[in-house]
Every structure is written in C-alpha cells, then in structure tokens.
Amino acid sequence: MGPLLQLAGTRLHIGIDDTDSIKGMCTTYLGFRLARLLQKEGAEFEDYPRLVRLNPNVPWKTRGNGAVGMTVNVSDPEAARKIAIDAVSLYSDLENGANPAAVFCEGGIPQPVRDLSREALHVMVEQERARGIIERHCSGLFYTGSGQGMVGAAAAIGYEFGDSTLELLSYRREENRGTPRPIWPEDVRGIQGAYPDTFNSYDEARGTSIIAPRGPDPVFYGIRGELASSLLGASEMVRTPERLEGYMIYRSNQGTADHLEYVIDAADPRPYSSGTISGVISTEPVVREGGHVFFEINAGGSMVPCAVYKESGMTDAAALLRGGDKVVVGGGIRRESGSHPKVLNVEFARVERLARIYRMANPYCTKCSKSMKSKGIGQGFKCTRCGAASIHRVEREIPRGISVGLYLPVASSQRHLARPYGRQGRTSRIQFDGASPWLGVFDSGE
C-alpha cells in the first residue's frame, strides 16, 4: 500500500483532455501512464478508467474526440493532483499544438458538471462557459496553451453511464511508434466469432482489420466489447512479434450512439451539432461526383439537405429512397459555406415507411400470367398465347428495392460512438472487478 491510500480517503475525480496532436500522442496513453503512477502510490480505483467520446463533429478534434477520466480514493488529494498535473505536463504533445487540461472534483460530482458533459456530446461548448462551471463547482483546474482541453476534461468527469462498453487498449514502446503495426488480419477476423460480445474488430464487408490505428500514436490496437474477460481472451488471439509496453481496459460510451439522442431543430440546425431528424423525403436522391448521394428531408415544413458519402457503404440504399418515404436520420450538421448550405452528414438512416409508387403498364393475362401486347394505338391489348383481350393499361406497383429497417455504415466507416447492428436494443450494466487484471505492464522500457 502506497502513501496516498488509507481506509478513510477522499474521493477524487480526475478528467484529462487534448493532450495529443495530429502528429502523435494519445490521451488514453496518458491515462494509462497516470493510472500506473496512481496505482503505485496506493490509490484505490472505484471503476475502470473512463474513455468518453464527445461530439464527433467539433472542428478542432484530433481524431476521435475522446477525453479520459478516473475516480480514485486517496488520503492526500493534493499529492494525487500533483501526480496528474506532472503527467499531463510530461506526456502532452505540446510542441505539436496540444492544449491540454486536467480538471479535479472531490466527493460527489456537481450537477452543472454532469449537465456540461451531456451538452458536450451534442453541440459545441464554449471554453469560457466551461471554465466558469469548473471554477465554481470543481476543486482544481490545470491547463497549458489555450486550455481547450478543459471542456473535455470536465465532460469526462461529469459523464453518466447508462449503457456502456469496454475497450482494451494496448500500447507500443516509444522506439516502435511510427512504424507499421505487425498485426495479421486472419487473427483479428476470428475475434468476434470466439467472443460474440466484442464488436467492430473486423470489417467483413471489406475484409479488413479495424482494431489498429494508422498514425504514429502510442496505441497498438484496441478491442471493444462488453466483458473484460472477453477482451483479455481476444487480446491473446492477436499474435505479434512486437514487444508492447502494456494495456489498460477503459469503460466507454463507444458503441452507444449516445451523441445522437439529441433531436436537431430542423428549422435552425446548429453547425457542428449531432443528433437526429425525422421527416419525409422531399426530393429524389442525386448521385454526385465521387458517388456521394444527396437528398432533402421535409421535417415539419423545414427542408434539411442530407449527404450520404460513398465511403459509408450506404449510398446504394440511399439512392433508392423516393419522395414520401418516412425516415429518421442521425448525424452531424456541417456548417454552410459559400458553395453549399448546412448539410446533415448521415451516420445512420432508419426507414420507417416506404411510399407506394405506381406506373402505367400493359395488363396481365389472368389465365397465362403473362403481360399482354399492344395491338396498336387505341386498339387495346391481346395475350399472344391464348388470345385474351383487354382495353386499358393498368396501374402497377413498382418494387422498391429497399426495405423498412435500419441502415448503418460498414464497420470500418463507423464512428467510435456508432451503435453497431449487434448492439441494437442492448444496454450493458458492466460491473467493475478491481481484482481483475484491468491494467497490465509488459515492458515499460524504463
């Protein structure tokens, strides 16, 4: 037992964000290092460290707009805060533009901080407003640079998990970062078969592994699921010759589609907001250069342009929509520019009702079940097989080629927060087992 922990300790919530840049680092890696440091000092973890994905449409995010938090019991909160601040100062990628922040709360989590977290899932939160909430309701704030990370850091503390998932993230030693990750797709392909509660490890539609990032950051791979035991077992299936530094399991809102619970105001959609819009298709879909599909929805009299991009794998279905179809779409609002209006970038579509479409056609022969032939203009129709005749063309319903139901991007194009098909209708109440190996160190290189 280290010097920070005793039976009657202080409950300390720590939130961290914006420690990375597009050139490297990852806030989850800083969380891994911080958790190790706190554990060594005897801090008691109440739950898995948390990885909270926030509004994916904010323009200044680096990759997945994820903030990290953790709740520990310590006898010396000031010493614990110093450990966290030192870690943020040491590991943040400051020279490449990171603007990190660490937020601290003691005891219970104030309701304004919870409200801020919920808001940060759907819209852009002004930094100064977040700072005011932090200074009034939290016990500490540290930041460098612009301090943009304070919004996510507070949100990581305030987020309330209803549904949740887990992610096991493994980390590379420093000398290997920036090199190709030696992972074999055939190993990854078997994970979801062996552990059905895992998800989005392999894209069957495109035949690709999707557990590893492509950039120079410290993450080697991440496996998502609902049971810690499954993640640990799945990690054993990923063979690699590379020596890794270690791993940590995070509780997360990934795979919950939590950011799409907000209903977007169709009359005045806020740029960069996330949510859903319900309405009726009002224009025929148009396929533009690149294979992207555009259409409009009439939502209570407001017309909302929508875009489905080729990379999503949903364009074939989107192109089959027709005027009068009732749909619910979810996604993010792209701001208007000189060349285009505000557009909802579609992340999912649920077709609730299909319009019935008819065309005039030659009548069928009821005896032969065959389409009759025209005898000439104004002369009616005749069956060439049995000779039966009919005078008028008939109205015939056209098969639509699309069904009522849910349409999602292929796995490799889904955002971190997207709820995959296998998690539709599910809510996971994951219990924390502090005695389980939720954090492991293989080789720190120290």
Curated annotation (Swiss-Prot):
HAMAP family, per database record: tRNA_Ile2_agm2C_synt
InterPro entries, alphabetized: TiaS-like_TCKD (IPR053870), TiaS_FLD (IPR013696), tRNA_Ile2__agm2C_synt (IPR024913), Zn_ribbon_TiaS (IPR055394)
UniProt entry keywords in alphabetical sequence: ATP-binding, Cytoplasm, Ligase, Nucleotide-binding, tRNA processing
Classification via Pfam families: TiaS_FLD, TiaS_TCKD, Zn_ribbon_TiaS
A GO cellular component annotation in the UniProt record: cytoplasm
Family to which the UniProt record says this protein belongs: Belongs to the TiaS family.
EC number annotated for this UniProt entry: 6.3.4.22
GO terms under biological process: tRNA wobble cytosine modification
Cellular localization per UniProt: Cytoplasm
Catalytic reaction list: cytidine(34) in tRNA(Ile2) + agmatine + ATP + H2O = 2-agmatinylcytidine(34) in tRNA(Ile2) + AMP + 2 phosphate + 2 H(+)
Cited function: ATP-dependent agmatine transferase that catalyzes the formation of 2-agmatinylcytidine (agm2C) at the wobble position (C34) of tRNA(Ile2), converting the codon specificity from AUG to AUA.
Superkingdom of source: Archaea
Broadest EC class assigned to this enzyme: ligase
GO molecular function: ATP binding; ligase activity, forming carbon-nitrogen bonds
Protein name per the record: tRNA(Ile2) 2-agmatinylcytidine synthetase TiaS
Organism: Cenarchaeum symbiosum (strain A)
Keyword Nucleotide-binding: yes
Main location: cytoplasm
Coiled coil residues, start to end: none
Gene3D superfamilies in UniProt: 2.40.50.1010, 3.30.70.2200, 3.90.600.20
Keyword ATP-binding: yes
